[in-house]
Structures are given as structure tokens and as C-alpha cells.
């Protein structure tokens, strides 16, 4: 076992870095966006860019790949800098780090430098206003690539100066193909259930999928990575358990549902917010057969989603997980009698 662990450590580096795309055509699941970005690279005529979309869908990989392809492997690091706005939200990041890099000339005869500002929607309004002025002042020798989860949080004057690209959540197919490639490279054995669990946990986030796979690989060194291993290492309940919990409550068996809830909280160690999130996924994805079997109407589904949202809000405000989740199950149990 010791030898296997040593072999595992020799192989190991962070897989999201090891398997990060280095060329635009390696970015998964964003074909239309990548095609347009490649046209900028081909002409080396790059506007300011704004990448919008959820985490783990290729925004950072695309920005780095653009720099690699425009400047080449010898010069891209000298002409590219990456900053994270969530580390410093105020105006100082613009006045100091961004301006200091922007005002220096490009290296090696490059036409311009690139500043990649990740999580730009974390910047305050004042910082964004200062950034807008900096973009104008240094546009002759510097291009900005901004990345955000929500483009609505970026002020209009910045949006109007950028070509905006929206990165969508990755499809199950795109995630599975990438995971299968990594599994082959790492000589891993993964069951079909393991792949399904990774896709379920990831929710379209490639970074989360790869991190979850690496965590599971460290646990199941000697055997195929299974569905159970993925759920255990990611602190995720089996979707079937959540489905049974909901069905039990909706059929009026509150005590049984509460017992299962306590098992998930105290034996499995799941957080209240995670459980609420999974309950929402099951309710929102209920198929017609399940709805018919439980005798639910459209109005019932609307009511369930409403109370789930209220419970989620209360948990984020610091309310007791046990009380709020039991109240949620009680509402489910009573909903059939209303």
C-alpha cells in the first residue's frame, strides 16, 4: 500500500492545472465562442473582452490560451498578467497593480500586453469607474480581458468598451469526454455510476468535476472509482436518497422523513444548504411520472419551490439548519392536505 501511495504522489500535481487547456481549440464545450476568439488570434487584432458565465466553464483557460497563441511560448508570460478582483475589491488594485503593468511597453516587439482581471464583478463601482478610465488611457498598448459570473454587475461604460462573450454551463457529454481523457492519462478505472456521479456533482463545472475526480482517486487507489466514492468525497447525498426523502414527506410520513434528514445531517455530515440545494434540484427536475404518482398539481410544485427558496434564504441568514429543514419537510407533508 505504501508503494502505491508513493507512486500516486509521484504522479500527482493539481489536475486542473495539469490538464488545463493551453490552446483555444482545447477548451471544451464552447465551440461558437472559441471560433470567434480564434479569429482574433489569427489576425492578432484583439479588442477588450468581457467573458461572462458560471465557474469552471473555460473563461480563464480561454484568456491564457489567447495570450499563449498571440505572444508565443517565449513571450506570453512577460506580456500577460492575471489578477483576481475578489482578492482586492477596491480602487487600489486599479491604481497600483493594473496601472503599473499597463504603463510599461510590451516585451519582445509584441503589439500590446494583456491584463486578465478575473471575477471583475467583485470590484466596487468606484473601482470599475477607475478601471474604465484606465482602459481608455492605455488602450494603445494594452488589452483587457475581464471575467465575471454576472455581466449585470459590470457597469455599462465598461461593457460598451468590450466584446462580450457568454460562456454557458458545460454539457454532460463535454464533461464526461474530458473525464474519460484524464482517467486514461492517469490509468484510472471508473464505473459508469462513478462518471454519472461526477457529472451530477459538477453541475456543468469542469473545474469541480476534475477536482472531485482527483479527490476520489486518492481514496480508491486499489479499485474502480464508484458512485458511492464520489458522493462520499464530495459531501453529496445520493440523489436517490434525496428523492426518497421528498417522496416520504409528500406522502405524509413526516417522522420517517425527519429520521432520514437527521441521518444526512449527523451521520453523513451534510450541510443544510447542500441538502436544500439537492432538494431543489429534485423538485425542479421532477418527471411527469413522479408528479402523477404523487398526485401533485402545477400549483403544488410552485408552492414547493417557493418554500424551498424561503428555507434557503433563512439558512443564509444564519437560522438553525435542523429547525428550518424539519419545517420544510413539515410543509411538504402538509401540502397534500391543503
Swiss-Prot record:
Q: Which GO terms describe its molecular function?
A: ATP binding; ATP hydrolysis activity; DNA binding; DNA clamp loader activity
Gene3D superfamilies assigned to the protein according to its UniProt record, in alphabetical order: 1.10.8.60, 1.20.272.10, P-loop containing nucleotide triphosphate hydrolases (3.40.50.300)
A GO CC term? DNA replication factor C complex
InterPro entries tied to this protein: AAA+_ATPase, ATPase_AAA_core, DNA_pol3_clamp-load_cplx_C, DNA_Rep/Repair_Clamp_Loader, P-loop_NTPase, Rep_factor-C_ssu_arc, Rep_factorC_C, RFC_lid
Q: Which Pfam families would you find in this protein's record?
A: AAA, Rep_fac_C
Could you list this entry's UniProt keywords, alphabetically sorted: ATP-binding, DNA replication, Nucleotide-binding
Task: Give GO BP annotations, semicolon-separated.
Answer: DNA repair; DNA-templated DNA replication
Q: Which residues bind ATP?
A: 53-60
Q: How does it assemble?
A: Heteromultimer composed of small subunits (RfcS) and large subunits (RfcL).
Q: Which family does it belong to?
A: Belongs to the activator 1 small subunits family. RfcS subfamily.
Q: What does this protein do?
A: Part of the RFC clamp loader complex which loads the PCNA sliding clamp onto DNA.
Under the heading NCBIfam families, the entry gives: PRK00440.1
What name does the UniProt record give this protein?
A: Replication factor C small subunit
Q: Which organism is it from?
A: Methanosarcina mazei (strain ATCC BAA-159 / DSM 3647 / Goe1 / Go1 / JCM 11833 / OCM 88) (Methanosarcina frisia)
Ranked from the top, the taxonomy reads: Archaea, Methanobacteriati, Methanobacteriota, Stenosarchaea group, Methanomicrobia
User: Which gene name does the record give?
Assistant: rfcS
Amino acid at each position: 500500500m505504501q508503494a502505491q501511495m508513493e507512486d500516486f504522489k509521484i504522479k500527482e500535481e493539481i489536475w486542473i492545472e495539469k490538464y488545463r487547456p493551453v490552446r483555444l481549440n482545447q477548451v471544451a464545450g464552447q465551440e461558437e465562442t472559441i471560433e470567434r476568439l480564434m479569429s482574433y488570434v489569427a489576425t492578432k487584432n484583439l479588442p477588450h473582452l468581457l467573458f461572462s458565465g458560471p465557474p469552471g466553464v473555460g473563461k480563464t483557460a480561454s484568456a491564457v490560451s489567447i495570450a499563449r497563441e498571440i505572444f508565443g511560448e517565449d513571450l506570453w508570460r512577460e506580456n500577460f498578467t492575471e489578477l483576481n478582483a475578489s482578492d482586492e475589491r477596491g480602487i487600489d488594485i486599479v491604481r497600483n497593480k493594473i496601472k503599473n503593468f499597463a504603463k510599461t511597453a510590451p516585451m519582445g516587439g509584441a503589439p500590446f500586453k494583456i491584463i486578465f482581471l478575473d471575477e471583475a464583478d467583485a470590484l466596487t463601482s468606484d473601482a470599475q469607474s477607475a478601471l474604465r478610465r484606465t482602459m481608455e488611457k492605455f488602450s494603445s498598448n494594452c488589452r483587457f480581458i475581464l471575467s465575471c459570473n454576472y455581466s449585470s454587475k459590470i457597469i455599462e461604460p465598461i461593457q460598451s468598451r468590450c466584446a462580450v462573450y457568454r460562456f454557458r454551463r458545460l454539457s454532460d457529454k463535454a464533461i464526461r469526454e474530458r473525464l474519460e481523457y484524464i482517467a486514461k492519462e492517469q490509468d484510472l478505472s471508473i464505473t459508469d455510476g462513478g462518471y454519472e456521479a461526477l457529472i451530477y456533482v459538477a453541475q456543468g463545472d469542469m473545474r469541480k468535476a476534475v477536482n472531485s475526480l482527483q479527490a476520489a482517486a486518492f481514496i480508491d487507489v486499489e479499485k474502480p472509482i464508484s458512485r458511492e466514492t464520489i458522493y462520499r468525497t464530495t459531501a453529496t447525498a445520493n440523489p436517490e436518497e434525496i428523492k426518497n426523502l421528498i417522496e416520504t414527506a409528500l406522502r405524509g410520513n413526516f417522522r420517517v422523513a425527519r429520521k432520514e434528514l437527521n441521518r444526512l445531517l449527523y451521520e453523513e455530515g451534510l450541510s443544510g444548504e447542500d441538502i436544500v440545494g439537492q432538494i431543489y434540484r429534485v423538485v425542479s427536475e421532477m418527471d411527469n411520472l413522479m408528479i402523477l404518482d404523487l398526485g401533485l398539481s402545477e400549483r403544488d410544485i410552485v408552492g414547493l419551490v417557493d418554500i424551498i427558496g424561503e428555507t434557503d434564504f433563512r439558512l443564509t441568514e444564519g437560522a438553525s439548519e435542523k429547525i428550518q429543514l424539519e419545517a420544510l419537510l413539515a410543509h411538504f407533508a402538509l401540502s397534500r392536505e391543503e
